[in-house]
Amino acid sequence: LVGSEMCIRDRDVLERMDEQMYYEYRAIMAMFKEAVEAMIQFQDAETGMFWQVIDKVGVPGNYLETSGSSLFAYAVLKGVRLGYLPKRFRAYGEKAFYGTCDKYLGVNDKGELQLSGICLVAGLGGATRRDGSLEYYFSEPVVENDAKGVAPLLLAYTEMIIQ
């Protein structure tokens, strides 16, 4: 989910900038807030998650995706904690976090925690089939317990408990 990755990037850059880069800091701060505000309009009203292709809600093959939703939750929650976003934005991060847990976090037949709804891989270029089409994005495997989904959820959880 590209929008979530942009939110993380902007928030990470802001955290490392010093006062000597005031104008650059202000520009990236504005981009971060703009990216979050743009993403909010695509947040699923029921679950708080984001669809694999965010502007194609309900298209057959599209699904609520764990890694992007968790990245968004993490970026927003940390952005609020560090003062980069207004406190009212915390509700959007919490909704994405809880929605992901409610929909995809459970216990498997062996009694182990299981996180599902994770896109195994998606990208553009390289192999000829990575053409950016809906068919391509919807054809990528959806997996369980992959680090690309588990790690962002744990990062978001960390922000949930330290605020």
Can you describe what each PLM-predicted range is?
Residues 64, 80-163:
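CBM-like carbohydrate-recognition segments
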Residues 28-47, 92-110:
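Long, well-ordered core segments of solenoidal/helical folds
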Residues 41-52, 126-130:
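Acidic-glycine-rich active-site phosphate/pyrophosphate-binding loop
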Residues 13-26, 79-88:
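Inter-helical turn/loop segments and adjacent helix faces that build the functional surface
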Residues 8-16, 74-81, 155-162:
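Short glycine/serine- and small hydrophobic-enriched flexible loop segments
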Residues 1-8:
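Short, small-residue-biased leader/transition segments that mark boundaries at the very start
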Residues 5, 31-34, 71, 92, ...:
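Charged catalytic carboxylate motif
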Residues 4, 24-28, 43, 52-70, ...:
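Solvent-exposed loop and edge beta-strand segments that line ligand/cofactor-binding
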